[in-house]
Amino acid sequence: MIFASKKKFIKPRRYKRCYVVTKRVLDNIPVGALGIIALDGCQEMGKRVNDYIVNWRREDSHEFKNDVVFKGYERDNYLIDAKVPRFGSGEAKGIIGESVRGKDLYLMVDVCNYNLTYSLSGHTNHMSPDDHFQNLKRVIAAVGGKGRRINVIMPFLYESRQHKRSGRESLDCALALQELVRMGVDNIITFDAHDPRVQNAIPLSGFETVRPTYHL
């Protein structure tokens, strides 16, 4: 009972159990809607991953599948349109064709795909690992910090063979990892890293190296 005055009593109303979704609740959700960005050279693999997740989530009886808090859990497509066009000078820029605000983004890049080419000054150039890594950074820059989390899937770890210094040499792999983390990358997933200890360059960030032999 709640006292409204000395003479009158107001009986509290009983409400049915309900869930009120507020901005604070949404901010406390540990995950965001899934978004997959497959860069050039990794689009076929990205499509296969997307198709698998679409079918899996469609058949999955997730308890909160239709909950507004988990909006976007089940969709027909998780791929996000992203492009890296080049200017006549050979320079490039990253473009994302849709909103990625609040999404968990997974960027897939194959730095050893040499089949991709681009034209420069009338010559055809094959893309090097450096070109692929720069394109990855361009797409991350296009996200602009609006994604909830950024995860990079890089089957072959960029500059992984330059993991230690033998004389007056640059530590390219460590610098690349630190650069990605500074740009807002939360997790880096690779396969069979040349030396997994390179993760010491980013001890406070996620780094996963999957050994193919384990799954074979």
What are these regions (language model features)?
Residues 1-216:
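PRPP-associated nucleotide enzymes
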